[in-house]
């Protein structure tokens, strides 16, 4: 979904750095990646992963994704993995208030034709509230400006994660 639109000329956002898999994926595609996380462990793991791949086109930022507008104002793509960092403290989770603030800024900052991918893990405490908040937010985006799609499995148990995809059709 993102690889279809991101080129070596583009700047992109990894809103939830985590273990650095998405940052690495984006760094291979884009000119510049801005990656955010509130956990030092995430920054270190990601720095190591990028170094092993020989990539240096990512700015790793120890801050919440809601601060992204302090670092850049327009970009081609953004990715979120909502939930918690699997190998870390499971009480440190993404929260609806900061996630919605970040999503608003992403919708403003996306270039025309730009895309955002939001993977929602919600089987943990607080996850259901964030899931509902995100779905409510994206369902209210104006259809003249955005296309929003949902990709989910329907025959899996135990709260399987699902993907929300946003494409910006035009500037305001």
In which residue ranges do the predicted regions lie?
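Mobile active-site "lid"/loop adjacent to the S-adenosyl-L-methionine
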Residues: 83-101
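S-adenosyl-L-methionine
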Residues: 1-11, 21, 44-74
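Class I S-adenosyl-L-methionine
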Residues: 127-172
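Conserved beta-strand signature within the Rossmann-like core of class I S-adenosyl-L-methionine
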Residues: 109, 113-120
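Conserved SAM-binding loop of SAM-dependent methyltransferases across substrates and taxa
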Residues: 19-31
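Helix-to-beta-strand junctions that scaffold the AdoMet/dcAdoMet cofactor pocket
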Residues: 7, 55, 110-112
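Conserved SAM-binding motif I beta-strand of class I
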Residues: 32-37
